[in-house]
């Protein structure tokens, strides 16, 4: 019997493998990314204290997006989370791509965050 491999299960396995070594600190939090077919979410996480320090997504009313599943929306989310992080006093983060390939919407979000002043 031929079965189709589950892409999301593979992504979760890759993410778990990376998360064993990757961790955010209060001085250098983790910029976590989650992508769905319609939206993209980004948040700064302090893993030591288990606290979310800043977040942004395509669902934010501040962005006023009609379509949240494209590269332009991902770049705007990256710029917004970067702006919120810089306003909160963070300039350096650890980028956690969530097991996704660094391509397309993930790369655009990262570029937007870099433009806003984050370093990673």
From Swiss-Prot:
What InterPro entries would the database entry show? Ribosomal_uL18_bac-type (IPR004389), Ribosomal_uL18_bac/euk (IPR005484)
Signal peptide bounds: none
Q: Indicate whether rRNA-binding appears among the record's keywords.
A: yes
Q: Which GO terms describe its cellular component?
A: cytosolic large ribosomal subunit
Q: Does the keyword Ribonucleoprotein apply?
A: yes
Locate the region Disordered: 1-29
- One GO-annotated biological process of the protein: translation
Question: What SUPFAM superfamilies does this protein map onto?
Answer: Translational machinery components
Q: Which UniProt keywords apply?
A: Ribonucleoprotein, Ribosomal protein, RNA-binding, rRNA-binding
Where is composition skewed (Basic residues) in this entry? 9-20
* Stored CDD domains: Ribosomal_L18_L5e
Q: For this UniProt entry, which segments traverse the membrane?
A: none
Which GO MF terms are attached to this record? 5S rRNA binding; structural constituent of ribosome
Tell me the function of this protein. This is one of the proteins that bind and probably mediate the attachment of the 5S RNA into the large ribosomal subunit, where it forms part of the central protuberance.
The family this protein is said to belong to: Belongs to the universal ribosomal protein uL18 family.
Q: How does it assemble?
A: Part of the 50S ribosomal subunit; part of the 5S rRNA/L5/L18/L25 subcomplex. Contacts the 5S and 23S rRNAs.
Q: Which PANTHER family match?
A: 39S RIBOSOMAL PROTEIN L18, MITOCHONDRIAL, LARGE RIBOSOMAL SUBUNIT PROTEIN UL18M
Q: What is this protein called?
A: Large ribosomal subunit protein uL18
Task: Please tell me the species this chain comes from.
Answer: Shouchella clausii (strain KSM-K16) (Alkalihalobacillus clausii)
Q: What lineage does the source organism belong to?
A: Bacteria, Bacillati, Bacillota, Bacilli, Bacillales
Q: Which gene encodes it?
A: rplR
